[in-house]
Design a protein with these regions (language model features):
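Flexible beta-alpha connector loops of hexameric P-loop NTPases
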Residues: 75-79, 287, 483
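Basic, low-complexity terminal or inter-domain segments flanking catalytic cores
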Residues: 24-27, 38, 47, 173, ...
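Intrinsically disordered, low-complexity regulatory segments
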Residues: 2-5, 9-163, 171-172, 236, ...
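Short glycine-centered, acidic/aromatic-flanked micro-motifs in structured strand/loop junctions
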Residues: 103-105, 282-284, 312
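Positively charged, polyanion-binding regions of nucleic-acid-associated proteins
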Residues: 254-270, 282, 457-466
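A conserved hydrophobic secondary-structure block that centers on an alpha-helix together
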Residues: 281-283, 287-291
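Phosphate-backbone binding and catalysis cores of DNA-processing enzymes
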Residues: 29, 41, 88-266, 356-409, ...
Length: 803
């Protein structure tokens, strides 16, 4: 152990300090077991590394937990599932001579270190805070050589965010329960993200498509060997109407064409900066199809394994070690010509984050061990980092202007050729929008000024203006970053939360057929035809739900500050100022609360004539009763009649794809034709209806979902019978074994294989055991073993213990 540290520094004083420390008992506490495992490899037997499994305490879940009168003092508690762990850490800390708090280096990590210090009742004289933005031997040893105190400014910045968000959530949610519907909740940053999605949806619905004609021509030009080759050119302007486009083609019939001007200029393309959290989330979504949450989970694993630097950062800076490593790797693989070392400047302030971009810890490692998904993400990070230190791509762009006799219009032909690929050899950046994609490079044939050109087909194609695209998770992150809303640590949770709360849903939209006109001038004849195309198809886009739209409109009206982009961005800046020690966190809380709380009180006192979000569609033919849409207890509903009528109102659930903002009176009335009875099967009635989860068949109190291919208005009794039988078959296959003497225990077949379910909890069955052979005693033994293992083996999802 001693010689292990003596390699670190020639400085005798440092050696003596480290030697003294190494003789003592050292306890290192980190957040995750994976991180602990990696660090343990570097520190040797004199150091014990334990994990806190994230935060060991938090604000009380079901209480406000903030004493506004006492300077916003928070009330923290240790969750029940962390108590045993905290006791273990207390015992270990008591026995240790030095405790090293090695949680992550951002605000969240600093807060974890502070909570550990407080809860474990550590003493300043034997507590050291160490930080590093990569888990490598040199980084860990350097951190141990340079410990510091807990930075209370960073802790206060994190605490301020947590408390402000708790105030907003706890005070706004009851307003939503009373005014919109029960069980809703509101979040500060999430509400702004929902607003962006709602506004984009309205822009799309309000968008008026305009048509215009794009004119392209094919010219036949002799190549270097005299062979005629095709050169494409485009008219410099769009033509508004079909009549004008036809007149233009007619004018071209007798016209002559000539090269008026040729310009050739060099073009340089510079590589993008290394990854920050948001650019990694965007590129992983575009190139690999990962969700924002998936990217962060994989990046965390890569970081904890020591493969990449810290994954929550808004810095594009690279250390000298990284640039040197990149240079060596580039020379080895591609030669000196491909090297161009660069220093990128970080534009966002964000003083709380790690001070380096996301990069591989060792640039010589072109690949790493891990799952296929981890390997792909690592490869993306490696390529982006290497590319950032590579030479510009050198291109040559040639533009030829072609005149038309008797017209002031000109055609333009553009050719581009890569002279030196530079960083493009390794990496090309992707785009959210297809329009941003660049055309493939192509050369123009040799041309001379004044050269007469022979034309092939000249085509006028009707094209349409494009509505704004819906957000993807990645483009929403980009927008939030542009607006200065949120920070690297908040993008992924924000996007997950708005979907979990069902304010936003990720989905696909089928395209619609559209006709467009094409006129072709060829062999002195104009051919006029209509073609069909599919337009507007979208995949994995974010759509606002009706509840999300109603909540957004309500908050925008009564709490404009919370929904204001500039206000939300200014709060982020205030958190940065707290982190830098420029301002007291309590004064920011007070300024916010003094304005916010009265508006909550005032809103609760307002009495409205209509329910929030209600929209009157018209009257029911024959009865004259009001037909409306509103948010009901379980989501959006169509209602015929009002509570004032003698008869009770009738309700119908909307179909998937219908929205409160766009549903028509006719579509609403159609919904009341359901449920409809199809007939009888096995002596019981079979009916079809629409519920909050879509259309269903109901038979003998059993609901069966309708597949997308079947329309509830057209389904036959025979088709319904088939669905009932298929559901029964699946149920039979799901139940493997039951025990009469213990009715709460059952062996089931799930989507991930067989498992035991008992008293609301699920337990794994080892792969080498045949589920059918298990006795009740064997099942109880497996349950006991897994319960004893505690939090280390508890998994989120199917095998999570239900509270």
């Amino acid at each position: 152990g001693e010689s292990f540290f003596l390699l670190l520094s020639p400085n005798i004083v440092v050696q003596a300090i480290i030697k003294e420390r190494i003789m003592q008992k050292n306890l290192v506490i980190v957040e995750s077991p994976a991180k602990a495992k990696t660090i343990e490899k570097f520190l040797g037997k004199d150091f014990k590394v334990l994990s806190s499994y994230g935060h060991i305490r938090d604000l009380k879940k079901k209480e406000f937990s903030i004493d506004v009168e006492k300077n916003f003092t928070p009330s923290y508690e240790i969750p029940a599932d962390k108590k045993a762990l905290v006791n273990t850490l207390k015992t270990e800390a008591k026995d240790a001579e030095t405790v090293w708090l090695a949680s992550d280096e951002d605000r969240e990590g600093e807060a974890i270190a502070w909570h550990l210090y407080e809860v474990l009742k550590l003493k300043p004289e034997n507590t050291k805070r160490i930080v590093f933005h990569e888990i490598t031997k040199s980084a860990i040893l350097k951190a141990i050589e340079q410990p510091r105190d807990i930075d209370l400014n960073l802790v206060n910045a994190q605490q301020a965010r947590r408390i402000l968000d708790r105030i907003v959530g706890f005070e706004l949610s009851p307003v939503l329960w009373r005014k919109v519907k029960p069980a809703l909740s509101a979040g500060r940053v999430q509400s702004v993200a929902v607003r962006l999605i709602v506004e984009r949806e309205r822009e799309i619905h309000a968008f008026q498509t305009e048509a215009a004609y794009r004119i392209t021509a094919v010219f036949l030009v002799p190549d270097t060997d005299g062979k005629l080759v095709e050169m494409k050119a485009e008219l410099a302007r769009r033509i508004k109407t079909k009549e004008e486009a036809k007149a233009f083609l007619n004018a071209c019939q007798g016209a002559s064409f000539a090269i008026d001007d040729i310009t050739t200029r060099p073009v340089k393309k510079t590589p993008p900066a290394p990854f920050t959290t948001s650019t990694l989330q965007q590129e992983a979504a575009r190139k690999l199809g990962y969700t924002v949450a998936q990217t962060m989970m994989l990046a965390q694993r890569l970081y904890e394994s020591g493969f990449i630097t810290y994954m929550r950062t808004d810095s594009v800076n690279l250390s000298e070690f990284a640039t040197t490593g990149s240079k060596d790797a580039i020379i080895k693989m591609m030669g000196d010509r491909y090297v161009h070392l660069r220093h990128f400047e970080t534009k966002t302030k964000g003083a709380q984050e790690a001070h380096e971009a996301i990069r591989p810890t060792y640039m010589e490692n072109q690949s790493v061990e891990g799952t296929a998904q981890e390997k792909k993400l690592y490869d993306l990070i490696w390529k982006r980092t290497i590319a950032s230190q590579m030479a510009d791509a050198e291109l040559e762009k040639t533009t030829a202007t072609i005149t038309i006799s008797g017209s002031s219009d000109v055609f333009t032909a553009i050719g581009e050729v890569i002279k030196f690929d530079g960083f493009l050899r390794v990496y090309r950046e992707s785009y959210d929008d297809d329009n941003e994609q660049e055309d493939e490079s192509h050369l123009l044939p040799p041309l001379k000024k004044g050269q007469k050109l022979e034309h092939g087909p000249i085509i006028a194609t009707e094209r349409f203006t494009q509505r704004p695209p819906r957000y993807t998770e990645a483009s929403l992150v980009r927008k939030l970053e542009e607006l200065g809303i949120g920070r690297p640590s908040t993008y992924a949770p924000t996007i997950s939360t708005i979907q979990q709360r069902e304010y936003v849903e990720k989905g696909n939209k089928d395209g619609e057929e559209r006709q467009f006109n094409v006129m072709t001038l060829k062999d002195r004849q104009i051919k006029d035809e209509n073609h069909t195309e599919i337009t507007g198809a979208e995949k994995a886009k974010l759509f606002p739900t009706d509840t999300g739209t109603v909540v957004n409109d309500f908050l925008t009206e009564y709490f404009p500050d919370i929904l204001d982009f500039n206000f939300t961005a200014s709060v982020e800046k205030e958190f940065d100022e707290i982190a830098e020690g420029e301002v007291k966190w309590t004064s920011i809380m007070k300024n916010f609360y003094d304005k916010f709380h009265p508006s909550v009180e005032n809103t609760l006192a307002i009495k409205t004539e209509h329910k929030v979000g209600e929209r009157i569609l018209g009257e029911e033919p024959g009865t004259g009763k009001t037909v409306s849409v509103k948010i009901g207890r379980f989501g959006p509903v169509v209602q015929i009649g009002t509570v004032e009528d003698e008869e009770k109102p009738r309700f119908a659930q909307m179909k998937k794809g219908q929205s409160m903002e766009t549903i028509t009176l006719e579509e609403a009335l159609e919904l009341f034709k359901l449920p409809r009875t199809l007939g009888e099967y096995e002596g019981k009635s079979v009916s079809v209806g629409v519920g909050r989860f879509g259309p269903y068949v109901l038979h003998n109190k059993v609901y069966v979902s309708l597949p997308k291919t079947l329309d509830p208005m057209e389904i036959t009794l025979e088709e319904a019978e088939q669905l009932i039988l298929e559901k029964r078959q699946k149920e039979t296959e799901r139940h493997i074994k039951k025990f009469e003497e213990e009715p709460e225990l059952e062996i089931l077949n799930g989507r991930y294989g067989p498992y035991i379910t008992y008293k609301g909890s699920n337990y794994k069955i080892p792969k080498d055991i045949v589920p059918q052979d298990l006795s009740l005693a064997s099942c109880l033994e497996l349950i006991k073993l897994q319960d004893e293992k505690g939090p280390a083996t508890t998994k989120k999802g199917r095998f999570a213990k239900k509270k």
